Amino acid sequence: MRDKVTGARRWVVKIGSALLTADGRGLDRNAMAVWVEQMVALHCAGIELVLVSSGAVAAGMSRLGWVSRPSAMHELQAAASVGQMGLVQAWESSFALHGLQTAQVLLTHDDLSDRKRYLNARSTLRTLVELGVVPVINENDTVVTDEIRFGDNDTLAALVANLVEADLLVILTDRDGMFDADPRNNPDAQLIYEARADDPQLDAVAGGSAGALGRGGMQTKLRAARLAARSGGHTVIVGGRIERVLDRLRAGERLGTLLTPDRSRKAARKQWLAGHLQMRGTLVLDDGAVKAVSQDHKSLLPVGVKAVQGSFRRGEMVVCVDQGGREVARGLVNYSALEAQKILGQPTDAIEALLGYVDGPELVHRDNLVLV
């Protein structure tokens, strides 16, 4: 199964607070440099990389001289504000030594639950990755309240993995992986090398609370792996202090715990598209577009659309029908109903002239289409 790791071409790497701050002693720039060197090696090997970095609150606590994590919301937000500055600067300077650009991206769960903002975030991240820039993502703790109190960056990392359709989510933690018993209390505890993410037996061994610096314990990492698995992604939970951990994972070494999905990414995404969104409108296709979509498995271009019905926004679900009204497919549109009306029947190179901008050459991308 480790071929799922060695063959992964798009990685999301999440690094926790305890690792980044040397268990609360401030940002561990030496450790960050070691991880950066390994991530640069991934980049040079042609692997697309997104980094989800915890540590803003913990770094802020260190800068402010606070020994214990505060419970008051305004103090947590203040610590996040102070810490985020140093955190981003540290990543930027470390990657710059190797000639790589970074980009700060602050997200909330709301950004990924609103479909329009979800698509905007996805477009931005894809563009950054295509440009060879390493996005450094953190939750926007400064302005979000519930996420500080209840959220965790393990969940955010899984959402980001789904957002960018990553092949692999790597969660670096202060433990070597998931064990069949708590290794702190049981010296005979054995590392679980591989398991299905949805295996109910994992719940019994994922107990335990989060550390004093962060918000996510092993239970949140298991939930994150299950969230990634819903879209067909694989997750490795592994010790961040293991020497050359990312290099060795890429080489196929059995480090940490590999949690696998029960179906392929394509099948998982298609199932989600088919069953989890309400239809907001209808696109009537000409015969050529019907063939392109249903037989050739191509994207739906504006030139093949004869009519637009209903009211929908970018990112919402529409039904695609032939001229006889038979449903052919359904998918997520790149343009609103009003915009679609303006570009229907037109070639792709006319979109910018008609709208003044281009959100994509397709009305519905083939990755966002499911045949019915």
From Swiss-Prot:
It is found in: Cytoplasm. It catalyses: L-glutamate + ATP = L-glutamyl 5-phosphate + ADP. Residues 280-358 form the PUA domain. Gene3D superfamilies: Acetylglutamate kinase-like, PUA domain. ATP binds at residues 14, 173-174. Its EC number is 2.7.2.11. Substrate binds at residues 54, 141, 153. SUPFAM superfamilies: Carbamate kinase-like, PUA domain-like. SMART domains: PUA (SM00359). Its main location: cytoplasm. GO terms for cellular component: cytosol. Pathway: Amino-acid biosynthesis; L-proline biosynthesis; L-glutamate 5-semialdehyde from L-glutamate: step 1/2. NCBIfam families: proB. Belongs to the glutamate 5-kinase family. This is Glutamate 5-kinase. It comes from Pseudomonas aeruginosa (strain ATCC 15692 / DSM 22644 / CIP 104116 / JCM 14847 / LMG 12228 / 1C / PRS 101 / PAO1). The gene is proB.
